[in-house]
Amino acid sequence: MAAPTASTPAYAILRDRLRLAILDGSWPPGTHRTLGALALEHQVSISPVREALLSLEGEGLVEIRQHRGAIVPLLDAKLFADLYDLRGALQSLLARRAAERVTPAQLDGIAAHAAAFEAAAKHDDAAAALRHNESFHAAIDGVAANPQAQAVVAARTAFVNAVRLRLGYGPARMLAAARQHETILEALRARDPEAAAEAAFAHVESARRDLLERFAEEQGRKPRP
């Protein structure tokens, strides 16, 4: 998640704060907050609160209720599995389209992001790896030139990244992801749409399995009521 700047819209700053509150449990699942209460708490007007909640609703983090503000649904394994189902379908589509139209210059850019991710993985730098992973996939998605699919993926990337930062990676997961990036890159270089789609889907499935394992471990460590 990029640090806010002077030009960052108020709703985006608030959205990031609320996302963090949801993920760290300070806005607990099953509880609702009104627009007015959120505006007062964060010293902003109603308008950025409404925009922030709409953005978080698009990520699946809140449900907006008429006259009740927003409620945080239960963050469970099914939610994460569903998100990765969506990512797998869309990122395989985008990789297929990218393989059909990628240029040598674009390949160089994608390769640079893959190399940066691998370097971060070798240093076990999860935060840097996440940034470079996002850049790698965004570069591929941009080549695919399907703004509708890109928008859906992008709307959920910040949530998935925030969850990943909280849960961490399993042993050798980042290095495995680096190898998977190289497989995707090889398919793009070969201009092989099917191979690119298959490699992208396998990459998402591998990430899904690792994140669900980390989530199960975290749930197992929580004290029982």
Regions found by a protein language model. Give the residues of each.
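Short alpha-helical transmembrane interface motifs in multi-pass membrane proteins
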Residues: 76-77, 163-167
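C-terminal regulatory/effector modules of DNA-binding transcriptional regulators
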Residues: 40-41, 172-225
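Helix-loop junctions at the membrane-solvent interface of multi-pass transporters
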Residues: 98, 144, 167-168, 215
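Conserved amphipathic alpha-helical interaction elements at protein-protein interfaces in regulatory
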Residues: 24, 28, 55, 142, ...
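Short linear motifs at protein or domain termini
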Residues: 1-100, 212-225
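Conserved amphipathic alpha-helical segments that form helical-bundle/coiled-coil interaction surfaces
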Residues: 83, 104-165, 179-187, 195-206
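Short, flexible turn/loop "capping" segments at secondary-structure junctions
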Residues: 63-65, 133, 176-178
